[in-house]
Regions:
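A solvent-exposed interaction/effector surface
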Residues: 1-172
Length: 172
């Protein structure tokens, strides 16, 4: 329970520091617990895994999307457990069963949304920021619903977004 609270504290600090700002950050190193077709399948898989591996409440759901310049399409959901958290899971967790994420450099931001997924305009703004900074975003977008709260008669989600890129020019 203490590890989970520390994760929440870290998430809240990151939200306060990064909300509405763009930066470059590596995608987190994590165990890929499952690749699912959507968030609903991800939740079912998480419940199934949780019955055999205690402590999986520390896993994160990353929605995977594709940005084409004209559209933003959902591709699935990854259930990720950040590296280092496996120490709190006990012997039931066999790390050899899971692949690790790659850690590409990404355009990074946290945004508020009415939905659990970013919309096209949110990602398009990230792409515009990237181009201004000599970066060429790839099509893949990862969105993590960090937390939500109720305000102004609606639920608001804090989405952590990673978008891998390649450099097309030297940074100024």
């Amino acid at each position: 329970a203490i590890m989970r609270l520390k994760l929440v504290e870290k998430d809240i600090s990151r939200i306060e520091a990064c909300m509405g700002r763009y930066s470059i950050r590596k995608f987190p190193k994590a165990f890929v617990m499952a690749n699912c077709s959507d968030l609903q399948e991800g939740l079912r898989t998480w419940f199934k895994l949780s019955s055999t591996i205690p402590g999986l409440d520390m896993a994160y759901f990353y929605n995977v999307l594709t940005y084409t310049g004209q559209d933003l399409e959902e591709k699935g959901t990854q259930l990720l457990l950040y590296e280092g958290l496996e120490k709190g899971l006990g012997q039931e967790f066999d790390r050899s069963l899971y692949s690790m994420t790659e850690e590409p450099e990404c355009i990074y931001t946290i945004i508020e949304s009415e939905y659990t997924h970013p919309d096209f305009d949110m990602i398009h703004k990230m792409v515009q920021w990237a181009h201004k900074h000599g970066l060429e975003p790839m099509e893949c977008v990862y969105a993590n619903d960090m937390t939500s709260f109720f305000a102004k008669d609606r639920t608001t989600y804090c989405l952590e977004i990673y978008m891998p890129f390649k450099r097309i020019a030297s940074p100024v």
